[in-house]
Amino acid sequence: MDAAGRGCHLLPLPAARGPARAPAASSALSPTGLCSGTTSASFAAAGAVAMNPSSSAGEERGATGGSSSSGSGAGSCCLGAEGGADPRGAGAAAAAALEEPAAAGQKEKEEALEEKLRDLTFRKQVSYRKAISRTGLQHLAPAHPLGLPVANGPAKEPRATLDWSENAVNGEHLWLETNVSGDLCYLGEENCQVRFAKSALRRKCAVCKIVVHTACIEQLEKINFRCKPTFREGGSRSPRENFVRHHWVHRRRQEGKCKQCGKGFQQKFSFHSKEIVAISCSWCKQAFHNKVTCFMLHHIEEPCSLGAHAAVIVPPTWIIKVKKPQNSLKASNRKKKRTSFKRKASKRGTEQETKGRPFVIKPISSPLMKPLLVFVNPKSGGNQGTKVLQMFMWYLNPRQVFDLSQEGPKDALEMYRKVPNLRILACGGDGTVGWILSILDELQLSPQPPVGVLPLGTGNDLARTLNWGGGYTDEPVSKILCQVEDGTIVQLDRWNLHVERNPDLPPEELEDGVCKLPLNVFNNYFSLGFDAHVTLEFHESREANPEKFNSRFRNKMFYAGAAFSDFLQRSSRDLSKHVKVVCDGTDLTPKIQDLKFQCIVFLNIPRYCAGTMPWGNPGDHHDFEPQRHDDGYIEVIGFTMASLAALQVGGHGERLHQCREVMLLTYKSIPMQVDGEPCRLAPAMIRISLRNQANMVQKSKRRTSMPLLNDPQSVPDRLRIRVNKISLQDYEGLHYDKDKLREASIPLGILVVRGDCDLETCRMYIDRLQEDLQSVSSGSQRVHYQDQETSFPRALSAQRLSPRWCFLDATSADRFYRIDRSQEHLHFVMEISHDEIFILDPDMVVSQQAGTPPGMPDLVVEQASGLSDWWNPALRKRMLSDSGMITPHYEDSDLKDFSHSRVLQSPVSSEDHAILQAVLTGDLMKLMESYKNGGSLLIQGPGHCSLLHYAAKTGNGDIVKYILDHGPAELLDMADSETGETALHKAACQRNRAVCQLLVDAGASLRQTDSKGKTPQERAQQAGDPDLAAYLESRQNYKIIGHEDLETAV
């Protein structure tokens, strides 16, 4: 490895076995023969590299790119490949170094080695078809080559974390324990130390992703295969290079396509494959086939572009390790005797500071560069933090990724403070973000770098506010880097909390409690009362018994129990009597006492308590403005127990004030919390004032890196997209095999959307498409798709989508990724698909008939007799089309006409009579059989009621569920012609709670009245079931709130 960080690691793996050949004695005796004897003119023309990794000179000057004092490691790689004019080649010095000790005093060992080589009947031959290979005779050399010292000390422990000391070694691997059984040892069969062992511990490098046995790490160091360089030495006299060279690594498995020929890599039997199929760069991620027609010699020396994320990667040429200065003997002799101990101590402190930071950053300014610092809290989100840390090390320079469990962010921010256009990504919860913002305040960086958030764990209200979502699922890190790079910089208000003793109370009346808050600055909220009391109980219990709080589910259960207990005890009921709140000179105490608030929140951002919006949208209330996180105002909100409960279903608290300064006085010890950190504060006077504004990165909906959105001509007016659904079982088992997962998907239908349609809008159209398909898939109409290859029609899935379905991103090269529902408005349809959309349904039941032909289907409709007039092209177009624009096809009037066109009919066929009899008698098996034989679910009984009316009245939940799954959607709210009652009215009158829940979950109307003006809730109350009435009322209120929020958002 030279000072510029060159690295061409191409030699630790053996080439494919060639035909057996008897070696010549002269070439087999010395490493020179191994290097020059096999490197012929045709071999050089093929661009192959041959050398003996066991030789010391080969380690330093060969194609592996090892350290070289002259700084020509990469250049030697080229000489070794071409052969050069000198017949001894790149390994000549190594050969001489090994032959001289042999001729000097080890004649017997040399003869023994010669005899061993003569008796050998098999020898590997360099393949001319391979671009990068080696001779493969290194395993015949002595375990410790002649001339090299044998290490007698204890085995070196594999390094798992970066070394930031002055002893750091460039190109050192970061080994992580792994249990991957499919990856073969990187050394290959010839050099693997435990090749005959059935099972051995393995390690995987987090930076270059090679896998070796733990026992083989020492052998890997002997052949000097280095990881990609992360810095450069500061003492080198060689001129500084402003570019980075490729770091080539052999791969037995490789995703994507070859950069040269555009073809995929052969991986049909990759699990057990021992052949090297690709050569890829650890920096730019380019990959080539391992053959001369694809990977050529000039690729070794060419500069690396650092790939798609070059703008955020910190190149190793920027990071310099400073050598400790050494005093000469003359200078030490001329030192004068010190007379001041104080001065000596000061110098010692300076030396300690210099020793702790032997690295400096010397960036090259460029307006296109946005270098990124990543801080990961591994303790957030269970094991998510550790996985995210490893993924960022693979995509970026490991020296720009920091583990907050090892050290805080201060040293890293201090080291990178002079880097222009710096951006920061905080991977953790809101507390991690606050920690980084406080350090930025302390360092007073100018300009302050903006901070993005990758939310881990739960809560994450600040991340939700900045459009990063409520938690990380499995979104590709590559897309996250693009989003951080293209994100919009916004400001976030930060507020000071100044605490003093309450001057109105004498010291002897102060109660027990702490005298200061856990934080003196907050970014999200500051609250007191009920919510802080519950959080405080949880923290105190966890500190007393930490072993009982090792599960997220247990933590949630404790929170729920503590909240319920506090509700019964009403410990915060007298909060309004012991506080005084003054906002910008306005005393809010009388209003607080009148409404008897049990919780008061000072809110800076719109989100609170894991995504709720307590301020809501003021709408017509002209006294208040919509909430913003950058307006210099803080919102004051009061909560009663009722409004706190309504908060979870879309409600909001009582808006009190929007102000710039708050004066809060407490007259007893009250539980409080600052950004989730609770305490019980003694009576105090708290002053809240604006501190400053921090720069944050907000996830942008329109990403500038997408050429689709930059070029208006590339955005089509309309897109015709097929929708396919995938079960959770198939997703978990096949998400790394896109072809098999595509084959396992089941088609839903076809949508026609606008070119700029986002996923949030697309979700509504998919739900409508599902309703139409449910209507058409009744007994009289069956929808099929046609296999493009076999032309055989097969029935579409009639199973309803569960409310928990989500979109899948199918554009990544390696696998499918789930998209968080809260971030659907940030993604366009064109960003996740080209001609088809995949959705994941976690509750989908996989049947034996489930499956999809390899070709994508087209919809074909099998018409039933008597309905040819109803099934017309206009109606079919309405079923299949999703207009991303407002068209008449989905207007309310059309939907009403569509519903009334499916009128009930009297039973005609024998199968219709059988279905009616099965519903009346509660025979589910007979119902299923009659429906499969062609019976219709749109028939009426003697009382002019639908089948769903009869099933709801009898209380047979299985039959109700079957009709809901297979019948048309209009059956839900179809009214009885005599009484005007729906199926939900019937179930409420009979007090069938399970049936009522099925109907409500299916979307039955809760506000539709019968001929007497009664709703289902009122019918349940008249039937003497107040619990059922309360349930229906709560569901009705929930839907009303959801509807109001939808209108507000629009």
From Swiss-Prot:
Extract the ranges annotated as region (Disordered). 53-74, 92-111, 328-356
Annotated motif PDZ-binding: location in the chain? 1048-1050
Q: Name one GO molecular function term.
A: GTPase inhibitor activity
Record's GO cellular component, any one? neuronal cell body
Q: Which UniProt keywords apply?
A: ANK repeat, ATP-binding, Cell membrane, Cell projection, Cytoplasm, Cytoplasmic vesicle, Kinase, Lipid metabolism, Membrane, Nucleotide-binding, Nucleus, Repeat, Synapse, Transferase
In what ranges is there compositional bias, type Basic residues? 332-347
**Pathway participation:** Lipid metabolism; glycerolipid metabolism
Q: What reaction(s) does this enzyme catalyze?
A: a 1,2-diacyl-sn-glycerol + ATP = a 1,2-diacyl-sn-glycero-3-phosphate + ADP + H(+); 1,2-di-(9Z-octadecenoyl)-sn-glycerol + ATP = 1,2-di-(9Z-octadecenoyl)-sn-glycero-3-phosphate + ADP + H(+); 1-octadecanoyl-2-(5Z,8Z,11Z,14Z-eicosatetraenoyl)-sn-glycerol + ATP = 1-octadecanoyl-2-(5Z,8Z,11Z,14Z-eicosatetraenoyl)-sn-glycero-3-phosphate + ADP + H(+); 1-octadecanoyl-2-(9Z,12Z)-octadecadienoyl-sn-glycerol + ATP = 1-octadecanoyl-2-(9Z,12Z-octadecadienoyl)-sn-glycero-3-phosphate + ADP + H(+)
List the expressing tissues. Answer: In brain, expressed in the hippocampus and cerebellum with stronger expression in the Purkinje cell layer (at protein level). Expressed in kidney.
Q: Which domain of life is it from?
A: Eukaryota
Keyword Cytoplasm listed? The answer is yes
Q: Where in the cell is it found?
A: Cell projection, Axon; Cell projection, Dendrite; Presynapse; Postsynapse
The EC number(s) given in the record are 2.7.1.107
Primary site of residence: other
A GO BP term, please? presynaptic modulation of chemical synaptic transmission
Pfam families referenced in this protein's UniProt entry, alphabetically: Ank_2 (PF12796), C1_1 (PF00130), DAGK_acc (PF00609), DAGK_cat (PF00781), DGKI (PF23578)
Effect of gene knockout: Homozygous knockout mice lacking Dgki do not display overt phenotype. They are slower to habituation to a novel environment, but have normal levels of locomotor activity, anxiety, and motor coordination. They display a small increase in presynaptic release probability and synapses show a reduction in metabotropic glutamate receptor-dependent long-term depression.
Q: Where are the ANK repeats?
A: 943-972, 979-1008
* Name of the top EC class for this enzyme: transferase
The DAGKc domain is annotated at 367-502
Enumerate composition-biased segments (Low complexity): 92-105
Q: How does it assemble?
A: Interacts (via PDZ-binding motif) with DLG4; controls the localization of DGKI to the synapse. Interacts (via PDZ-binding motif) with DLG1. Interacts (via PDZ-binding motif) with DLG2. Interacts (via PDZ-binding motif) with DLG3. May interact with RASGRP3; involved in the regulation of RASGRP3 activity.
**Which family is this protein grouped under?**
Belongs to the eukaryotic diacylglycerol kinase family.
Q: What does this protein do?
A: Diacylglycerol kinase that converts diacylglycerol/DAG into phosphatidic acid/phosphatidate/PA and regulates the respective levels of these two bioactive lipids. Thereby, acts as a central switch between the signaling pathways activated by these second messengers with different cellular targets and opposite effects in numerous biological processes. Has probably no preference for any of the diacylglycerols in terms of the acyl chain composition, especially for the acyl chain at the sn-2 position.
Protein name as annotated: Diacylglycerol kinase iota
Primary gene name: Dgki
